[in-house]
Curated annotation (Swiss-Prot):
<feature type="binding site">
    <location>
        <begin position="22"/>
        <end position="23"/>
    </location>
    <ligand>
        <name>phosphoenolpyruvate</name>
    </ligand>
</feature>
<dbReference type="GO" id="GO:0009252">
    <property type="term" value="P:peptidoglycan biosynthetic process"/>
</dbReference>
<comment type="function">
    <text>Cell wall formation. Adds enolpyruvyl to UDP-N-acetylglucosamine.</text>
</comment>
<dbReference type="Pfam" id="PF00275">
    <property type="entry name" value="EPSP_synthase"/>
</dbReference>
<dbReference type="GO" id="GO:0005737">
    <property type="term" value="C:cytoplasm"/>
</dbReference>
<dbReference type="GO" id="GO:0008760">
    <property type="term" value="F:UDP-N-acetylglucosamine 1-carboxyvinyltransferase activity"/>
</dbReference>
<dbReference type="GO" id="GO:0051301">
    <property type="term" value="P:cell division"/>
</dbReference>
<dbReference type="InterPro" id="IPR013792">
    <property type="entry name" value="RNA3'P_cycl/enolpyr_Trfase_a/b"/>
</dbReference>
<dbReference type="InterPro" id="IPR036968">
    <property type="entry name" value="Enolpyruvate_Tfrase_sf"/>
</dbReference>
<feature type="binding site">
    <location>
        <position position="328"/>
    </location>
    <ligand>
        <name>UDP-N-acetyl-alpha-D-glucosamine</name>
    </ligand>
</feature>
<feature type="binding site">
    <location>
        <position position="92"/>
    </location>
    <ligand>
        <name>UDP-N-acetyl-alpha-D-glucosamine</name>
    </ligand>
</feature>
<keyword id="KW-0808">Transferase</keyword>
<dbReference type="GO" id="GO:0071555">
    <property type="term" value="P:cell wall organization"/>
</dbReference>
<dbReference type="GO" id="GO:0008360">
    <property type="term" value="P:regulation of cell shape"/>
</dbReference>
<comment type="similarity">
    <text>Belongs to the EPSP synthase family. MurA subfamily.</text>
</comment>
<dbReference type="GO" id="GO:0019277">
    <property type="term" value="P:UDP-N-acetylgalactosamine biosynthetic process"/>
</dbReference>
<keyword id="KW-0961">Cell wall biogenesis/degradation</keyword>
Amino acid sequence: MDKFVITGGVPLKGTIPTNGSKNSALPALAAALLTAEPVTLHRVPRVRDIRTMERLLVDIGTTVDVEGETVRLRTERIVSPEAPYELVKTMRASSLVLGPLVARSGRARVSLPGGCAIGARPINLHIFGLEQLGAKINQTHGYIEAVAPDGLRGAVVHFDRITVTGTEDLMMAAVLAKGETLLRNAAREPEVVDLAELLIKMGAKIEGAGTSTIRIQGVESLGGAVHAIIADRIEAGTFLVAGAITGGDLTVTDCIPEHVGALVSKLQQAGVDVTQPSETTVRVRGTGRLRSVDMTTEEYPGFATDLQAQYMALMTQAEGIAVVIENIFENRFMHAQELARMGANIRIDGRQAIVAGPRELTGAGVIASDLRASASLVLGALVARGETVIDRVYHIDRGYEKIEAKLAGVGAKIRRVE
C-alpha cells in the first residue's frame, strides 16, 4: 500500500489548479444510463471513485471511452441492471445507478454502498422515494432489488432529511416517469444543479434545481449531450486551507469562489487574508497568528461536511478554543485521534470537537481512515516539525487527483512511496 512521506514547515507559495468535481462527475456518469445516445463529459477527474463507476457502467452495458479528462459514454441497451458488491464495495456513490436503471429498464439490483466508514448514510431515503414513484423494492442479502415493469409515475416526494445523492437519484428516476414529480426538502448543492443542467441538455424538463423544491415533468426519452463538470469545491477548499495553515501565499485557480463562500468567511474570521483576483481564482495569504473560530457543518450553502476535517487541522494552529460541530454525518471525527498523535489538543464530545491551540505539531506515523480525514492529515503534516508518514493513502486517491504532485508544485516536501 502506498504512503505519503511529508516534511513540514514550508509555506506554500504559487498557483495550484482545481480539477472537475468528483461529486458532480459521479452522478453525471450515472445519467448516461438514461439514454441510448452518446453523452460526452469534459473535466472528469481521474480519481479512484470515477474509475470504479466507469467499470460499473461497462458491466451494465455502457461503452466508455476515456481520453484525458474527457469521457464518452453510450448505453445502447442495459445488458445487466446490476451493481455487484465486488465492484461497489469501496464506493458509496453506487446507489446513484439505482434510479437510472429502474427508470430506463424497469429493474435494478444494486449492492448496498461502501465508501467511507463515517456513520450512517441512509439509502432508505432513495428507497422511499422510488417507492413513491411506483417501484417495488426488496432488500435481501445486502442488495436492493427494485422493479417497475410498467414504468415509474410522477409523485410528490418529501425527504425527511436533506440528502444529496438521494436528490440526484430521484431526479434521474423522475425524468423518465409518467407525469410530474415534486421533490421537497431537496438538496441545494452545486452538484445537484450541475446534474440538472446536464439532464436538461439531454431533454429533461426540470425546474428549481438549487432550491429546496425541484419540479420534474417526465418525458418519453432523453437524447445525448456534451457537458463540462463544475470545479471541485472540496479540492479548492482543501488547497485554501493548505495555504492558510502553512502561512503561505497560495492562489487556487479554475474554481468557483461562490461555492467555497462558507469556508472563505471562516478563514477571514480566523485572520487569513483572502482575496478573489478573478472570477475563477481565490488567493490566501497567511498574516501571522490565527484566531480560533467555531464552526458548524450544514447543508449547502452552509459549511461543507467534506471540509470539516481540514478545518479542524487548521484550528490546531489557532489561538484559543474552537468548537467544531458535525451536523451531517455521525462518527466523522476519526481524524482527531491521528492529529492528536501529532500533538493536537482535541477533545471529542458527541457531535462536537473542542480544539485548543495553538499546538506545535510534530511528525509521526498516522493512518488515514477515510477520504477527507486523510486530507486533514496531509494538512497537519505540512505544518508539523519533522517527518510524517501517512499510511493507507488509497483513501485520498478516491477523491484527489495527484494531490502530492500539486502540493509539491507549490513547495511542499511530499512524496509517495510504496
